[in-house]
């Protein structure tokens, strides 16, 4: 459910009204601000969840910058041409991903979800999955 304030064009999306987006590997993403939900044209926000011991597929975004905030959990953020760079991430960290940057979030916990708040500067993203790169064991 979301509420639309006609006077100011403010849209409030409740958790029950979030838009189910793509699955990328084991990662799921629910949008709260999107073109469909709020009519946004220059921003998008979502919550991405990576279950314990799992990861997204390796990928990059063609048309947008992304900013992520680690809201819960810990893991790694793989990046680089061959995903050879592994940075540990944990609650409170911010991550900037430019267009075209290969990346893959990985949840190393055996018990906790890795929860990422995702913002990007385009209402619809164009994603290229990198089937031959990244972790395959998660």
What residues fall within each predicted segment?
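Ligand-binding loop in jelly-roll beta-barrel domains
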Residues: 86, 90-91, 99-126
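Conserved short histidine dyad/triad with adjacent acidic residue
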Residues: 29-33, 46-62, 99
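Short, charged/polar surface micro-motifs in flexible loops or helix N-caps
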Residues: 38-41, 51-54, 74-76, 122
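Conserved hydrophobic/aromatic beta-strand scaffold that supports enzyme active sites
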Residues: 45-49, 67, 86, 94-96, ...
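Residue-level recognition of conserved beta-strand positions in structured domain cores
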Residues: 47, 60, 79-81, 107, ...
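A short, N-terminal "cap"/entry segment at the start of jelly-roll beta-barrel domains
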Residues: 1-42, 57, 129-138
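A short beta-strand-loop-beta hairpin characteristic of the jelly-roll/cupin
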Residues: 55, 64-91
């Amino acid at each position: 459910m979301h509420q639309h304030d006609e006077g100011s064009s403010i849209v409030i999306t409740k958790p029950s009204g979030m838009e189910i987006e793509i699955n990328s590997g084991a990662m799921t993403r629910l949008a709260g601000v999107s073109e469909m939900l709020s009519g946004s044209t220059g921003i998008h926000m979502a919550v991405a969840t990576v279950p314990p011991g799992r990861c997204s597929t390796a990928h990059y975004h063609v048309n947008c910058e992304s900013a992520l905030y680690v809201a819960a959990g810990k893991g790694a953020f793989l990046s680089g041409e061959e995903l050879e760079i592994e940075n540990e991430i944990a609650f409170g960290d911010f991550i900037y991903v430019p267009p075209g940057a290969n990346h893959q979030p990985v949840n190393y916990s055996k018990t906790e979800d890795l929860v990422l708040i995702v913002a990007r500067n385009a209402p619809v993203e164009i994603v290229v999955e990198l089937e031959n790169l990244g972790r395959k064991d998660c």
